[in-house]
Amino acid sequence: MAKEDVIEIQGTIKETLPNAMFKVELENGAEILAHVSGKIRMHYIRILPGDKVTVEMSPYDLTKGRITYRFK
């Protein structure tokens, strides 16, 4: 997937699911399923319900995404 096709949006973690998946409520009110990016996994960054995150989404499937940043 090319970098230009990615949609970046802010959201809040609502629920933790098995296999490092999360329910994320986006700023626009939509709720999506998101997984953790490799860099976050590599550096053992903890993501808990209530955390503010940045999510990358593909324009082809707006129900799934990848968490790329957790705000401090």
Swiss-Prot record:
Belongs to the IF-1 family. Residues 2-72 form the S1-like domain. The keyword RNA-binding applies. The lineage of its organism: Bacteria, Bacillati, Bacillota, Bacilli, Lactobacillales. Its main location: cytoplasm. Component of the 30S ribosomal translation pre-initiation complex which assembles on the 30S ribosome in the order IF-2 and IF-3, IF-1 and N-formylmethionyl-tRNA(fMet); mRNA recruitment can occur at any time during PIC assembly. GO terms for cellular component: cytosol. InterPro entries: NA-bd_OB-fold, RNA-binding_domain_S1_IF1, S1_domain, TIF_IF1. Keywords: Cytoplasm, Initiation factor, Protein biosynthesis, RNA-binding, rRNA-binding. One of the essential components for the initiation of protein synthesis. Stabilizes the binding of IF-2 and IF-3 on the 30S subunit to which N-formylmethionyl-tRNA(fMet) subsequently binds. Helps modulate mRNA selection, yielding the 30S pre-initiation complex (PIC). Upon addition of the 50S ribosomal subunit IF-1, IF-2 and IF-3 are released leaving the mature 70S translation initiation complex. It is found in: Cytoplasm. SUPFAM superfamilies: Nucleic acid-binding proteins. PANTHER family: TRANSLATION INITIATION FACTOR IF-1, CHLOROPLASTIC (PTHR33370:SF1). GO terms for molecular function: ribosome binding; rRNA binding; translation initiation factor activity. This is Translation initiation factor IF-1.
